[in-house]
Amino acid sequence: MFDLSACHVNRNADEDYEISWRTLEPGHRVSIYMSDDPEFFYRHQNPGIPLLTTCDTKALIANTDKSVRHYFYLQSEQGEGAILAERKLSLEGTPNFRDLGGYQAQCGRTLKWGKLYRSRKLSSLSEKDHQYVKRLGLTLVCDLRQVLEQELEPTFLGEDSNHNYVSLPVSPGSRGNFMENLHRGIIAVEDSS
């Protein structure tokens, strides 16, 4: 079994992938698979042909297309697996764009990769960033900045972006009740696209 808290995917200076992991039984062979489809490893029981099989706890995988997001499946020789992706995405205009996938809830379920992201403001994305974010398939952007911040630096994801935008300003000191109020309907969420 993989220790998900010790499984990581990062890009190096050449934008190739450095993957590291820890298993509860070290020394076993691990096969690594790659896809550009975030749902591929969730849908298919057969991940295909491995890029690499190793007894090590790290691997360097060539990034064959730097404009596309890649997802990885690590499979132990016992058949146990872990789906991984980069936590911090390489965007020029916002250095803190992160995928929240891979985190485990108290109930034991794991959030899928490529479904929920968090970031700072999206108003300073480069054209290259716009193309990269478009391929992520975002459907909803929730802006938690204060209204003045949203007005001064509006979120823009490109002319042909296909997402809904929701303004959900969080005032300083109001974080404690924000989610509770959202669930109770005190804070309204409207489609403003």
Q: Model features per residue range: what roles?
A:
Residues 1-193:
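Cys-dependent protein tyrosine phosphatase-like superfamily
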